[in-house]
């Protein structure tokens, strides 16, 4: 049995930018995940369920667990003095860590993805993305350090809190998964160099919004539902409502996750920096593909901290198909 810490140290030689700082940074995220796991598992016993009464910068009502997870991860990262600053879905602006100007890395995170599901005991997750800063070491970080394209990520991953808690990450050398053993207090390696199955047969989208979708996405959904034995259609529809949970299932079973633009969200709804980029990095490392319907996600130059984007991620052939439908059936 190999632990996450042992695995990271063992694989450092595969990573060109390997440093003790990055290893310690991943360990800090691991600690934060353990704390969140512990409290999610007793969420019904303590007063951390439901809405907090506050809103985040996007105008969305924050759940108590959103704020709890944000504070715990922020504290875990700050305590190690290895991160110069963070950007979070739950913070209006970047958070600069005073006294950490010497640190080389910045972290972007969605502390608790799918938190509206927690009240009904459905899987939720944490998403993280790590970059090397671009401003001089020794100075406070600025927004410039965070507004980097996804192809500059040095590591990314997620934690899914479900029937078991699992941490999945990449440093650009494959995707690896670790299951948390609460009796030992460690994450243990369960899958190394994960890959999407050759063919996907599942599509994940909130079909309740069908009438609001672009024409190309509507046509693709109909394509998924048509019978064609040569392409194993119709595909199965599965949608949990938590990006981490839906992505994780599709990574294991094969499939595509779709979150297109709508009239109310013409740029899309998912955040480019906190959700799309890290998941796109993982997808490509697992042999998949991620796109906004027209452009590779990892090549998009971000313009603002909380920028949104349409998002299609999963098996390469399925993302290719949805891109083709979007090209062939443009909106009037």
Curated annotation (Swiss-Prot):
Residues annotated for substrate binding in this entry: 113-116, 206, 239, 257-259, 269
Record-linked CDD domains: FBPase
Signal peptide: none
SUPFAM superfamilies linked to this entry: Carbohydrate phosphatase (SSF56655)
Subcellular location: Cytoplasm
Catalytic activity: beta-D-fructose 1,6-bisphosphate + H2O = beta-D-fructose 6-phosphate + phosphate
UniProt binding sites for Mg(2+) 1: 89, 110, 112
GO cellular component, one term: cytoplasm
Subunit structure: Homotetramer.
Name of the protein: Fructose-1,6-bisphosphatase class 1
Lineage, uppermost ranks: Bacteria, Pseudomonadati, Pseudomonadota, Gammaproteobacteria, Enterobacterales
